[in-house]
Regions:
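Structural signature of tandem-repeat unit edges
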Residues: 25-30, 38-60, 69-86, 96-110, ...
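Intrinsically disordered, low-complexity repeat and linker tracts
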Residues: 1-21, 32, 119-128
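Short, surface-exposed basic-aromatic patches at helix termini and helix-loop junctions that form
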Residues: 93, 116-118
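Short, surface-exposed terminal/edge motifs of secreted or surface/virion proteins that either
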Residues: 111-115
Length: 128
């Protein structure tokens, strides 16, 4: 039987790093904390990840998730579970002005507000 990792455990999936925020057999969640290759140009934050048979919903983004991301040109956010409370204060402060952020259509208005409130430069394009 698949056992979820403990709260605080760091998981690496497809070049992204996550921290377990809730550990249950059903309903485990993780926070996107960054990515391993800082030269990566495209980063996708998925709706969920699966590690050793356990599914974790991606529900938050950590404060330093995008620090030192000088090469990033496209950030695709697929999860629909982000809120102002689940995105750390200065998360998007260091994202370059040329970066394009793609968000789910149904969350465009809400995410635009959240991302700007969390330090995203007004020159960064947000697309549906």
């Amino acid at each position: 039987k698949a056992e979820p990792k403990k709260v605080g455990a760091i998981l690496k999936v497809k070049g992204n790093k996550y921290k377990v925020t809730k550990s249950k057999v059903k309903g485990s969640t993780v926070e996107f904390t960054g990515y391993t290759n800082k030269k990566k140009k495209k980063v996708t934050i998925p709706e969920s990840i699966t590690v050793q048979g356990v599914e974790y919903d991606v529900t938050s983004i950590g404060e330093k998730a995008f620090s030192n991301c000088k090469k990033l040109t496209l950030l695709e956010i697929k999860t629909k579970k982000l809120t102002k409370k689940t995105v750390a204060k200065k998360t998007f402060k260091s994202i370059r002005k040329k970066t394009v952020i793609k968000v789910p259509k149904s969350k465009y208005k809400a995410y635009k507000k959240v991302l700007r409130a969390r330090g995203l430069n007004k020159k960064v394009k947000i697309k549906k």
